[in-house]
Amino acid sequence: MHRSYAVLLRNNVARLCYRPGSTLFIRNFTTRHSLRQSKPWYLDISENKEEDSNSPFIKPIRFPPTEIPASLETISKYLNDKLAVTDIVVFDTAHSSSATSIQSMASYVLIGTVKSFRHLQNCNDELIKFIKETFDEVPKSEGLVTSGILRKRQRRLGRKTNLGKIAKIENDESGWCLIDSNVDGLFINIMTEERRDDLNLEELYCRVEELDQYKKQINLNPPAEEEDDVLLGLRKLMMKNTKRYYSTVGESPKPTFLEALTIQDLDSASKLIKEEKKPYHVIASALGRLPNHIELDAENWIKLFNEATPTEGPLDYEYWGARFKFFQLLYISKRNNIEENTQLDASTIKEFNRELNYFINDFFRFKQLALCQPTREELIGFLEICIQHLKLSKSYNQLISVNMWILKALQSYQYSDPKVVHDPRVIKLLVKSMHTENTNLNSLYEYVNLITNEFEVRSLTNDVIKEIITTLVESENWPTLFKFWKQCLCESAVDSNVWDFFIKSLLNKNDKVILSDIVDNGHLLWIHRSKLVISDDLKASLSKLLDRVDGSHTNIKKLLKL
């Protein structure tokens, strides 16, 4: 019975589906159903509409009117778009007229608002990671209570039930972090809205014309507390009678020894000397990091370095290297400040001369008193300083003063290393220190005669020989020049390069008597005697020399194959 009824029902439905009028309806129904089933309902999501930037509830990023680097815009958009930091304001402190200490540390300051303390922690971690990956810099974050420290405080405060509310208050007060991005001098302040309203940093960093816009409005009629709040009264009474044996406010972080030196807080650095294993090395390193144009208090810096000198045990090589570098950096900083001053007077140079004289008395004599011998590298470094010092004033008195300092320094090597004056590096610097563009000392010629008679000219480098030739040609001291040149030829200390330099120096001076003497007195025959390989440059110089001297000089040209 039931089976026949089911068969009949199926046949009737089949005939109905195959009717001409209802075929199209069934097909359309089937197509719609299959299309609807091909895309599930949970994937049928309408595309997000773009945010309306003109909405009064969405504040755009406010950049300064001055030109900003691309990195600043990248970081600001990342904070706003990816980390949901709102109300972002960027201030240009580098071009600001306000006298704040942030100008010496940061060029730009960014201020943004987060929703909660947990949001602040996440933004701090993600932003540091983003800067490391994008700009390959390591930012430095301060002021944020990390999650680990926060859990320790909560466990400590949770041991007493009557202090349970304090932890929440402390968390709310720590909703601020400062990040030094190390990218184009950008400092980033991220804080909660309550903390931002409380600090009002915009008033500190804004321009003078924007001061009224960011000035904090003081509410003269604050809402009165509810006097019938029994719980509030009990809480105040409990806090009043509770005796705490600890502080719930964290101590402000003390600057390290290097940080105190960087900001030139020498008093704080003096208190931290004992915490460093080798403070003298840190002092020299910190002094080298300071900008060249910053004016230094040399007296207090020297006093601090003397405090860092070890009082027990011998002073090692590393200490003396740091001390010499320290005095070098002090001199360079002082000289840069003097060179920036276009109006150089005699009193300024005289004071600077006294400081350089102190360099000799302090370093070289102190090292001898400590039973340590100065090295050649220290003498060479000091001679280089003296030569740079001659550029400030090219007077004859300045030349005498510099040579007196050099003489004092050389006396420190009289017994420990007397052969230091035979070092080619020292000889070259000593010759340079005895003359300027228009002034020469008589000791210069005496020193060259000493080199000619007592030293091994063969051991001199080409640079030393060229320096002596240049000095004597400019001063036109021909007897001393030819005496030295003859000794160089006798010891076979002259190659093709030096010969070319010697002839070109005489050609530039263009003294026809001297040029004729070179050709007529047989100086050029030394080229043939020493079997010197004549280079192309030397051939050209010899041809110019013979052309300027009267006569055909056929024999010399044939002998030298010119």
From Swiss-Prot:
Reply yes or no: does the keyword Membrane apply: yes
Q: How does it sit in the membrane?
A: Peripheral membrane protein
GO cellular component labels: mitochondrial inner membrane
**Which InterPro entries does the annotation name?**
Atp25, ATP25_mRNA_stabil_dom, NT_sf
Offer one example of a GO biological process linked to this entry: mitochondrial gene expression
Subcellular location field: Mitochondrion inner membrane
Main localisation: mitochondrion
Keywords carried by this UniProt record: Membrane, Mitochondrion, Mitochondrion inner membrane, Transit peptide
Q: State the SUPFAM superfamilies in the record.
A: Nucleotidyltransferase
Q: What Gene3D superfamilies does this protein map onto? A: Beta Polymerase, domain 2 (3.30.460.10)
Record has Transit peptide as a keyword: yes
Q: Where is the transit peptide?
A: 1-36
Function, as annotated:
Probable mitochondrial mRNA stabilization factor.
UniProt cross-references to PANTHER family, sorted A to Z:
ATPASE SYNTHESIS PROTEIN 25, MITOCHONDRIAL
Q: Which family does it belong to?
A: Belongs to the ATP25 family.
What is the official name of this protein in its record?
ATPase synthesis protein 25, mitochondrial
List the source organism.
Kluyveromyces lactis (strain ATCC 8585 / CBS 2359 / DSM 70799 / NBRC 1267 / NRRL Y-1140 / WM37) (Yeast)
